[in-house]
């Protein structure tokens, strides 16, 4: 993700409710699980996507803690 995409993503996250953030986090965790499974099987072509998803989950958790 480029810097502007990251800023837009975080801005979008800040507009969501806690329930929506939790739902988005769960979706990304499922995607991360699938990516790890593909990586273990040697089928993953976009290896950078693993780190991208991890960082997106961390951003969601940061926004969640900001709003508590």
From Swiss-Prot:
GO terms for biological process: translation. SUPFAM superfamilies: Ribosomal protein L29 (L29p) (SSF46561). Pfam families: Ribosomal_L29. One of its GO terms (cellular component) is cytosolic large ribosomal subunit. GO terms for molecular function: structural constituent of ribosome. InterPro entries: Ribosomal_protein_uL29 (IPR050063), Ribosomal_uL29 (IPR001854), Ribosomal_uL29_CS (IPR018254), Ribosomal_uL29_sf (IPR036049). Keywords: Ribonucleoprotein, Ribosomal protein. CDD domains: Ribosomal_L29_HIP. It comes from the Bacteria. Belongs to the universal ribosomal protein uL29 family. This is Large ribosomal subunit protein uL29. The lineage of its organism: Bacteria, Bacillati, Bacillota, Bacilli, Lactobacillales. The gene is rpmC.
């Amino acid at each position: 993700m480029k810097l502007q995409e990251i800023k837009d993503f975080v801005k979008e996250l800040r507009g969501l409710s806690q329930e929506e953030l939790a739902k988005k986090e769960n979706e990304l965790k499922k995607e991360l699980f699938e990516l790890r499974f593909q990586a273990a099987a040697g089928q993953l072509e976009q290896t950078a996507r693993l780190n991208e998803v991890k960082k997106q989950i961390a951003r969601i958790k940061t926004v969640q803690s900001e709003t508590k």
